[in-house]
Swiss-Prot record:
Species, as recorded: Prochlorococcus marinus (strain MIT 9215)
Known function: Specifically methylates the N7 position of a guanine in 16S rRNA.
Ranges in coiled-coil conformation: none
Alphabetically ordered keywords of this record: Cytoplasm, Methyltransferase, rRNA processing, S-adenosyl-L-methionine, Transferase
Record EC number: 2.1.1.-
GO cellular component: cytosol
Name the UniProt record assigns to this protein: Ribosomal RNA small subunit methyltransferase G
Localization: Cytoplasm
First-tier enzyme category under EC: transferase
Amino acid sequence: MKKQNIPEEILSLITEEEINLFQELQIKIKELNNKTNLTRLTDGDDYWVSQVFDSIWPFKAFTNINFDNKKFLDIGSGCGFPGLAYAITHPNSEIYLIDSLKKKTDAIKFLVKQINFKNNIHVINDRVENLAHQSSMRNNFNIATTRAVSNPSTVSEYILPMLKKEGFGVLYCGKWTNEESKNLDKTLEILEGKVKDKKEIQLPRNKGTRNIILIQPKNFCPEIYPRKVGKPEKNPL
């Protein structure tokens, strides 16, 4: 397939085989969009920067951390990003994609069947507030992330209960302020977590500022978290 209009910043991060898989994924997402309103980010920079690059660069940026061969959780996966992007670039990892909307999980299942992923991929239609209190899911992941779901404090309440003691939570944020940093520190203190690292980047093609906050458990998260459905969103810690 042709590489027209794919930003150089992406081409420098992924292999020829991975480019082909991302192009196949783009085609299938467009097919799905003809039947259901899955995402508006399907063409040009909307796809290659806002979806692909934004999903994969954090796992290339923290060079002191090995993100390969891990158990990976994407919370609120939507149309499959960042989870499917991570799957393409980390084929030895086991992937769990969860979303509360059946329309979204049905779409992701279709994509998984259509694309030649090498991973073991699980797609679950449920709320993280429910799954986090199941012994088969809690404290079970090396990496957990969510993108475009909620504020960092709420997202931390979703992520930390799912992580193994040595695991990492990957928080996708826009511009990062001192107030947000203080609020996150307060939340992490309650959840027995800590900030491990942070990186900021200007996305290609003037797509804005992106901050990635890496969080990590200090101890296992108290069992009462996450709270019941809706509480983390309405009343952040």
